[in-house]
C-alpha cells in the first residue's frame, strides 16, 4: 500500500518544503504566547530547502491543562494571519504547535489534517519528506502524517515506551521507503517529551533544534529569535 507523505508540491521545480513544529515545556504553567508568536513569524518567512518555502496550509496548537488534559485549537489559515487567536492561549507547562505545508493540492483546506494530533494522554507532531513508501499492510489514515501517528499509537498501546515507540516506527518506515530525506516526530504525555530527529543526510533544513531559556525548554524544526539554538 503506497502511502503519501508530507511533500510540498511547488510551482518552482526542485523546491522542497516541510511543515514546521515547536514543542515547549516548563516546570510550572507560564505564558508561552510570545514564543508561539515568534514561531508564527518565523513560519511566514521560512524558506524551503532550495528557495521559497510555504507553511501556510493550516496550523494547530495543543496545550496541557492540569485538570482537563490536552486542549486543541486548529485552523486552515496560515498561522501568521491569526496572531490574535494565539493571544487567547492560557498559561501552560506543555505546548505543541504545528504549521502545515500540505503535500498535495487536494489535501489542502481540511482542518482534520492540521496537527497536533491528540489521543489522550498523548499529543503528537510530525514533519518529514519520505519517498516511495510501501508498508507491508494497510494502515488507517488518508495522509502520511495520520498513518505515522497510527503506527506510533499502535506501539504505545502495546506498552512500548514513547522514545522506543518513535524509534521503532522510524525503523519500520526506513525499511519500507525508497528514500527518507527527513522524518521528525515529537510526542508528549503532558509531563515529558520524546523526540526523533530522522535526518539521515544531516541537512540543516531537516534538523531539529533545541534551546533552554532559564527553565523553559524549546525544540523546534527551525531556529527563531535571538537564542543560541543547538542541534538536537
Regions found by a protein language model. Name each.
Residues 14-77, 200:
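Extreme N-terminus nucleophile/cap motif
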Residues 19, 61, 96, 148, ...:
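A residue-level signal for conserved active-site and pocket-lining positions in enzyme catalytic cores
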Residues 19, 113-130, 174-232:
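Conserved catalytic micro-motifs used in adenylation/nucleotidyl-transfer and phosphoryl/amide-
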Residues 50-56, 63, 70-77, 91, ...:
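Domain-scale activation on soluble regions of proteins
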Residues 45, 74-89, 97-120:
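Short acidic (Asp/Glu) patches
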Residues 10-11:
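Serine residues within intrinsically disordered or low-complexity segments
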Residues 131-189:
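Short histidine
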